């Protein structure tokens, strides 16, 4: 294997080939596109005709059936494309296609909250091949998107700053290529678990990076190494804001079957996509849910996910927290730096949104061993019970914990406390909470008090102090 790798690198030192196309320019297999450690094989992208990039337009007026448009004034003007709206391109990844339901579903969620030109970019002609070839074909896709964006600018006076390109997997790097070719003029690029193989550790010219748009954000969901873990996504930061939900490696609800570990990356076909790539696909599912949950994906600046999980990164700072997904561009500090890392937790199935709270309970009553749980009641909803502490319960002691609720309760009105230990105790001990404070991610604290105690498995309601 080492010999093959060495030979490939030696071949990479040989003078490269180049192909040129009228509209899109020239493409070389020279370094860094080929012949480097991360992509040792000399491979050119296929022709534009073979890749066959298509633009499938959905709008608020045609939500169920796309209109295929091209960089042609009459074709665009006869469509439902509106120049007074933002335009969001969605680019699929390896093996996928533009007509796949998740792209149209993402558009439909957008139509619930905004008027928008939603363009699904289909390049299945170039995505359904070996991975190495597909990773080169995205250069053609990126060039086609850049050509389309430039056409909108020159022929229709449509500013690239009104363009948002969303790419999944290889589509993230196609978006980066489009951004590079438009000199960073595109308003926003979102990378949904940007593909790792042939891109992790490569020069910025090759992959998505912060210079590709005015604002670049990324969601990382499958960041384990491709060998031996078959993690398809990058762990490397690629944007101004990089989000690592659930740590960015293993997503709740995704249990990889052992058979998925032996599937070669050049042989994962459509039928095994969900089976083998659950973590990788979570990124676009999170983004889709975020569109209709504008406060449900608050993410926290933290040194690492382990520090976040140790409850050391709450609440949000005075400038607030960014929302992972659709509304990341509302964050005031979005371009204050590059490679800003943020962490959060999600649910294990849709709706994936969660709202984080910190609850502190000061105990009263008798000393026992057991568990204490709290549920929240607010003007927007009620939460289920969450465990705050288990162990020795001492009166006067305060115990704190953070949890991610599947309900945004809004402004807190009351809380309910319960304890249990499943131990038969003839003395029937009583435990209470003299005070409970609840802090939201915006830093607002609600305080509740009670002078009562209760027996095991009996609810105690605390009202505002």
From Swiss-Prot:
The protein, known as: Pancreatic triacylglycerol lipase
Alphabetized SUPFAM superfamilies for the sequence: alpha/beta-Hydrolases, Lipase/lipooxygenase domain (PLAT/LH2 domain)
GO CC terms: extracellular space
Catalytic activity: a triacylglycerol + H2O = a diacylglycerol + a fatty acid + H(+); 1,2,3-tributanoylglycerol + H2O = dibutanoylglycerol + butanoate + H(+); 1,2,3-tri-(9Z-octadecenoyl)-glycerol + H2O = di-(9Z)-octadecenoylglycerol + (9Z)-octadecenoate + H(+); all-trans-retinyl hexadecanoate + H2O = all-trans-retinol + hexadecanoate + H(+)
Subunit structure: Forms a 1:1 stoichiometric complex with (pro)colipase/CLPS.
Gene3D superfamilies, per database record: alpha/beta hydrolase, PLAT/LH2 domain
Reported regulation of activity: Inhibited by bile salts, is reactivated by (pro)colipase/CLPS.
Free-text function comment from the UniProt entry: Plays an important role in fat metabolism. It preferentially splits the esters of long-chain fatty acids at positions 1 and 3, producing mainly 2-monoacylglycerol and free fatty acids, and shows considerably higher activity against insoluble emulsified substrates than against soluble ones. Plays a role in hibernation as a key enzyme that shows high activity at low temperatures. When expressed in the hibernating heart it liberates fatty acids from triglycerides at temperatures as low as 0 degrees Celsius.
Binding site for Ca(2+): 204, 207, 209, 212
Signal sequence, renumbered to the chain: 1-16
Keywords, in A-Z order: Calcium, Disulfide bond, Hibernation, Hydrolase, Lipid degradation, Lipid metabolism, Metal-binding, Secreted, Signal
Subcellular location: Secreted
Tree of life domain: Eukaryota
Entry-linked InterPro entries: AB_hydrolase_fold, Lipase, Lipase_LIPH, Lipase_N, Lipase_panc, PLAT/LH2_dom, PLAT/LH2_dom_sf, TAG_lipase
Gene: PNLIP
One GO MF term attached to the UniProt entry: lipoprotein lipase activity
Tissues/organs with expression: Expressed in many tissues with highest expression in liver. During hibernation there is a significant increases in expression in heart, white adipose tissue (WAT), and testis; but not in pancreas.
Induction: Up-regulated during hibernation.
Organism listed in the record: Ictidomys tridecemlineatus
Main localization category: secreted
SMART domains attached to this UniProt entry: LH2
Residues the record marks as active site: 169 (nucleophile), 193 (charge relay system), 280 (charge relay system)
Stated family: Belongs to the AB hydrolase superfamily. Lipase family.
Annotated CDD domains: Pancreat_lipase_like, PLAT_PL
